[in-house]
Amino acid sequence: MFSLTRHTTPCPEPINGQILQMVVDNLTDISSVALPPSNLLYNIYQYAIGFEVHLYLEALSGEKGIAVELVVATDAQDPEQVIGFLLCLPVKDDPEACGIPFMAVQAGSRRHGVGRAMMQDVLARYPHAELACSVEKVPAFEAMGFQVRGARDTQVLMNTRSYGTDGLMGVLDVAAIYRSLEVQQIHTYLLQRHGKRAMVDAERQRDRHLDELARKVQAFVTGERG
């Protein structure tokens, strides 16, 4: 059993810490880059996605000028233990709409309805929701009421309706994270540890991987419409 809590203000630090750990542990699953751990650049993307979610959690304070809500699932037996979370970005000028940039459930708590319950909680307030996911996750989101709308780079764009919202949704500047000093330091460390050739190979592998994902998504979406 589990409990759901909706947060519209900053969470206690222990909750944030568990959410960020879940994000880092599930990079391949929830990132649009979906790099495997075998790629040498994995640590860079781990840091970047963790920092991105950290910024969204900070934005619950209202100080970043974007609307953010958070649904947290905790173990009913141990309320301090986070087993899932869903980040929701309400849309300005459209009270029924939201975007869902991140959602994850602890590996040991999957297939117990946690993800579905968090999604139902959000859809009860924002029935017009949009998200992007991997091809493999499409059936799970279809079961929650989403439909395929198209391709967004390396992911399938899904919506609970056949059209997107006309309202504005505040998002963070992710590109700035990759230009940050911290990311440069991680890259320098990896370069010193593995050498330039290995890092160039890792970048080529990443680029091929992203091209393959984009082709896979495009083929899937074309097939769906066919």
Segments predicted by a language model, with ranges:
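Short active-site oxyanion
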Residues: 125-129
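Terminal substrate-recognition subdomain of acyl/acetyltransferases
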Residues: 1-33, 132-226
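A conserved beta-strand-loop-helix scaffold within acyl/acetyltransferase catalytic domains
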Residues: 30-97, 102-103
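Short loop segments at secondary-structure junctions
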Residues: 76-77, 108, 161-164
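Conserved acetyl-CoA-binding loop-helix of GNAT-fold acetyltransferases
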Residues: 105, 110-124
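Soluble or luminal CAZymes and related metallo-dependent hydrolases
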Residues: 11, 15, 45-52, 110, ...
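A structural signal for short, well-ordered beta-strand segments and their strand-loop junctions
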Residues: 99, 130-133
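Beta-hairpin (beta-strand-turn-beta-strand) motif
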Residues: 103, 108, 134-136
